[in-house]
Amino acid sequence: MLQKTKGIVLSYIRYRETSIIVKIYTEVLGLQSYIVNGVRSSGNAKSGGGRMGLYQPLTLLELVVYHQERANLHRIREIKCPEPFVYLPMDFQKTGIVLFLTELLSKSLKSEEPNPVLYQFLHHSIHVLDGQQEGVQNFHLQFLLKLSRYLGFATPTADDFLEEVSPYISADAIDREAVERLLLEPYGAPIPLNGERRRHVLQMILQFYRLHVADFGDLKSLPVLQEMQG
């Protein structure tokens, strides 16, 4: 049946010579995969669903899709991007954050059950990242801590968080002050963290996710993010 929904692109893989399979987290249908035929052919580069730019990580979409219960792959009838990014594609640092976040979201979002509250959080956060001018280097840290609330495993305080991760983290990497401020402050708040403290906090947060997300493992994009942030 036809279903209208908003969606956030997580990733895609090439399929055959000219097609892709794209993974999209939707507002109405949860996590879904769609096959898009001919999108990589030169003759279809600017027509309808054939624009590869629509399938870049974290792109915000409006979709009309053919959805069949119990099917693993679905098809897109109509697609548009009513909220194109303004700054994100041209910002080197933000691009690194996007690659990191999409890999993490692909590991963390596994349910086909819709979660409109989670979707709205993701939608809002992506808008913030696009427009944010100050404190961008801390965005991914705040995002991951906030996301854990919507995934159902957030801790109420920094002390509770540290109690969970401290057995797995070296003592010199524990930074209670940073975690507390990142938990409490809104996006963009001036939280002075140097590169070393930022890496330590991220190490703690990723360990926290490993404790709660099955098969979380390591993130291939992490070295790229750390190199970009210095």
Regions found by a protein language model. Give the residues of each.
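Non-catalytic alpha-helical scaffolds and adjoining flexible linkers that form interface surfaces
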Residues: 1-18, 25-230
